[in-house]
Regions:
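Extreme N-terminal, non-catalytic leader segments
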Residues: 1-11
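Hydrophobic anchor at the beta1->P-loop junction of P-loop NTPases
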Residues: 14
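The conserved Walker
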Residues: 17-18
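Conserved nucleotide-binding/hydrolysis micro-motifs of P-loop NTPases
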Residues: 42-45, 97-98, 123-130, 176-178
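Conserved phosphate-donor/acceptor-positioning beta-strand/loop module used by diverse small-molecule
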Residues: 113-133
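Small-molecule kinase domains that catalyze NTP-dependent phosphoryl transfer to phosphate-bearing small molecules
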Residues: 138-184
């Protein structure tokens, strides 16, 4: 736990559909703020023993993207985040967090660890998301397996973020420049 001279660590969760810029923006925020970042894309693959760089394009809600395996992935990621918080380390949990129970579980962990909490919801137009996902798929770069079909599936099951007070939740439209989105988040974290 923290003594009076140690600043409270932050637990930040991202949420939003694939292709909205969560990882791109939060990798930069993590670098600027010195926060650790845990990504569901890497953790999911590590749990099945494959390299995060290996792409596993499965249908929405199938294989390592099934409801059961997704639940296991989120629980593991949140537990790993809790370990860092208890060491006084600020951490970003980079994932879609489409379900209220996932977001609420992370919030409870932050409270128990006496950490500050922020849910950052990422949005952009469907056209922009589709463009980004097509570019990502064509380039085969990064660890994400997100594609347009996944975006469409996530959109159908994404539960509105209405469980947090305004001071615990911000929405960032990533249609503007990356720098602008990063600056909005940094400014919010420094309040």
């Amino acid at each position: 736990m923290n003594d009076d001279n140690t600043p409270q660590p932050y637990l930040i969760i991202t949420c939003g559909l694939t292709g909205t810029g969560k990882s791109t923006i939060m990798n930069e925020v993590a670098e600027k703020k010195g926060f650790m970042i845990l990504t569901s894309d890497k953790i999911r693959k590590e749990l099945v023993g494959i390299s995060p760089e290996v792409h596993k394009y499965e249908e929405f809600d199938k294989g390592i993207y099934s409801k059961e395996f997704t639940e296991r992935t989120y629980i593991h990621m949140i537990e790993e985040g809790e370990k860092l918080l208890l060491q006084g380390i600020s951490v970003i949990l980079d994932a879609c967090f489409p379900k209220k129970w996932q977001r609420e579980k992370a919030f409870e962990v932050a409270k128990e660890a006496n950490a500050r909490f922020l849910c950052i919801e990422f949005t952009c137009s469907e056209e922009e998301a589709k463009y980004r996902l097509t570019e990502r798929f064509d380039s085969k770069e990064g660890v994400s397996d997100g594609r347009w079909e996944i975006y469409v599936g996530q959109k159908q099951v994404f539960e509105e973020v209405d469980e947090f007070k305004p001071e615990l939740h911000i929405v960032v439209d990533t249609s503007s420049s990356k720098e602008e989105s990063v600056n909005i988040i940094i400014k919010r974290l420094e309040q």
